[in-house]
């Protein structure tokens, strides 16, 4: 980010957060107009602490199956300041408890797995309302992953729109062109902006290339002017 002007890449402040709607995971993209927002930072700090607590519980459960992973082991896998189940899987591979990340999730880390631990998640509607109160821009991320379609997806969009939803992520690498068009129609119907991207997650998703998907200059300008 320090080389933003030098390499001629414009950065925008934002985060992705996981929320819940009727027991389904709903992902939201939050674009911030300010670099720092005290209320948002306080919420993120709370969520970070809850994530650490969840991680510690998962590690405790893994001990029952002779998979001994310490927080120090995990730190070797983490480049940022957030620990995820993917990092736990990497640590399990490094110590020889599993052969692959897929095996770690299938047996231990997936929802319902031997060492699974439920996440404390925000309510989707309350999250959008909060984002708008702090002056952020809220976009429904990769709607395909909600598992909703047709009328049920439209109902969710209506409810989120009532709370101030600004956009839908219509461009996403793991969906068909037909699905992209469906999400564009939803945006046009409810006066929402288009967002999109490659959903790059570093080496956790090595097959997804940074910048492989994105929005046009015109679509970006609309978001900036929101």
Identify the meaning behind each predicted range.
Residues 95, 103-107, 198, 208, ...:
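Flexible, active-site-adjacent loop/turn segments at secondary-structure boundaries
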Residues 1-83, 163, 169-190, 194-205, ...:
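A metal-dependent hydrolase metal-coordination microenvironment
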Residues 156-171, 210-226:
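Structural recognition of alpha->loop->beta junctions
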Residues 53-191:
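Domain-core and long-helix interface of multi-subunit machines
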């Amino acid at each position: 980010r320090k080389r933003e002007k030098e390499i001629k890449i414009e950065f925008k402040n934002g985060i992705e957060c996981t929320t819940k709607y009727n027991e389904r995971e709903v992902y939201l993209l939050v674009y911030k107009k300010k670099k720092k927002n005290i209320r948002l930072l306080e919420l993120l700090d709370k969520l970070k602490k809850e994530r650490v607590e969840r991680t510690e519980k998962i590690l405790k459960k893994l001990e029952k199956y002779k998979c001994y992973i310490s927080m120090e082991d995990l730190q070797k896998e983490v480049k940022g300041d957030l620990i995820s189940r993917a990092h736990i899987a990497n640590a399990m591979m490094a110590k020889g408890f599993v052969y692959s990340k897929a095996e770690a999730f299938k047996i231990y880390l997936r929802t319902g797995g031997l060492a699974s631990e439920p996440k404390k998640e925000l309510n989707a509607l309350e999250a959008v309302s909060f984002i708008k109160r702090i002056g952020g821009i809220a976009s429904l991320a990769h709607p395909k992953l909600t598992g909703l379609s047709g009328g049920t997806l439209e109902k969710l969009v209506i409810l989120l729109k009532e709370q101030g939803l600004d956009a839908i992520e219509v461009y996403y690498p793991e969906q068909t062109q037909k699905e992209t068009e469906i999400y564009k129609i939803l945006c046009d119907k409810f006066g929402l902006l288009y967002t999109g991207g490659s959903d790059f997650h570093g080496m956790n998703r090595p097959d997804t290339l940074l910048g492989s998907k994105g929005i046009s200059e015109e679509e970006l300008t609309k978001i900036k002017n929101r």
